[in-house]
């Protein structure tokens, strides 16, 4: 569970709801018609932008914003160095006995053990990276589309409410409440866009970048093992993938 995503979502809504309660009754901020326009309208408009597979596939990818935990690059480097040492001592077949928890790393090692040359291994791993990145980009795009559409649907709902209000001006006392209800759709659209959809899209983009970086690290490590490079050289080379802070920490140790 990603604590930052969960805390951000709950905390953001908690403060907004608290402000509503302090400003008056929470009931004045609830309107079922406005919710239907923003939520229902957004779903079907976004559905028009994507295929059914891309739309519903985004719900699976969305779980990565809350549940996904990327492998730490230093842990991947340590595992690759361990495998490089084993390969130098016992050959590539010795890698079959090692426990590998990362599926992409396992795929690369399987290609080595099967005896494929470096070009085949590189091409296969690059293709895997590209296709995974494409799937994640599509999933992120769905949530960005929701973030774009929700405020627009909110504005449409507000315009609908204003038209209904202006068509019935007989009772001046009803104008204020009618205007408040009309503005609720804009509020709902802004809340969903800026507190749900765009933050999830940004977190998914971060996850995608982290996963792509890790996979490139693994690919370079697997190819270095295949090339028979010294484990120390591999370790030094792969540490270029670490950020400056972690690299400095590694040097100090």
Curated annotation (Swiss-Prot):
Membrane-spanning parts = 6-26, 28-48, 146-166, 180-200
GO biological process annotations for this chain's record? bacterial-type flagellum-dependent swarming motility; chemotaxis; proton transmembrane transport
The record's listing under Pfam families reads:
MotA_ExbB
Q: Where is the protein found, in the record's own terms?
A: Cell inner membrane
**What GO cellular-component annotations does this UniProt entry give?**
plasma membrane
Which residues are exposed on the Cytoplasmic face of the membrane?
201-253
Q: Which domain of life is it from?
A: Bacteria
Tell me the keywords, alphabetical order: Cell inner membrane, Cell membrane, Chemotaxis, Flagellar rotation, Hydrogen ion transport, Ion transport, Membrane, Transmembrane, Transmembrane helix, Transport
InterPro entries per record: Flag_MotA_CS (IPR000540), MotA-like (IPR047055), MotA_ExbB_proton_chnl (IPR002898)
Q: How does it sit in the membrane?
A: Multi-pass membrane protein
What the protein does comes down to: PomA and PomB comprise the stator element of the flagellar motor complex. Required for rotation of the flagellar motor. Probable transmembrane proton channel.
Subunit annotation:
Each stator complex is composed of 4 PomA and 2 PomB subunits. 2 A subunits and 1 B subunit are thought to form a single ion channel, so that each stator complex contains two channels.
Q: Which family does it belong to?
A: Belongs to the MotA family.
* Matching NCBIfam families: PRK08990.1
* Entry protein name: Chemotaxis protein PomA
- Chain's gene name: pomA
């Amino acid at each position: 569970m990603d604590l930052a995503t969960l805390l951000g979502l709950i905390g953001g809504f908690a403060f907004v709801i608290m402000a509503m309660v302090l400003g008056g009754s929470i009931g004045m901020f609830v309107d079922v018609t406005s919710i239907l326009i923003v939520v229902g309208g957004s779903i079907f408009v976004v559905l028009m932008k994507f295929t059914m597979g891309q739309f519903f596939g985004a719900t699976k990818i969305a779980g990565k914003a809350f549940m996904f935990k990327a492998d730490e690059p230093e842990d991947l480097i340590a595992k690759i160095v361990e495998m490089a040492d084993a390969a130098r001592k016992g050959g590539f077949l010795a890698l079959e006995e090692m426990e590998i928890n990362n599926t992409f790393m396992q795929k690369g090692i399987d290609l080595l053990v099967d005896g494929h040359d470096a070009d085949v291994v590189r091409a296969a791993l690059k293709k895997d990276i590209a296709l995974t990145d494409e799937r994640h980009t599509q999933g992120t795009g769905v949530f960005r589309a929701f973030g774009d559409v929700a405020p627009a649907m909110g504005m449409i709902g507000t315009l609908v409410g204003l038209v209904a209000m202006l068509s019935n001006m007989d009772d001046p006392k009803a104008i204020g409440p009618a205007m408040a209800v009309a503005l609720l759709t804009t509020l709902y659209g802004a809340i969903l866009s800026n507190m749900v959809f765009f933050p999830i899209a940004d977190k998914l983009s971060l996850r995608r970048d982290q996963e792509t970086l890790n996979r490139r690290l693994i690919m370079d490590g697997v190819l270095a093992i295949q090339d028979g490079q010294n484990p120390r050289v591999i370790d030094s080379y792969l540490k270029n993938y670490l950020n400056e802070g972690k690299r400095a920490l590694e040097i100090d140790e």
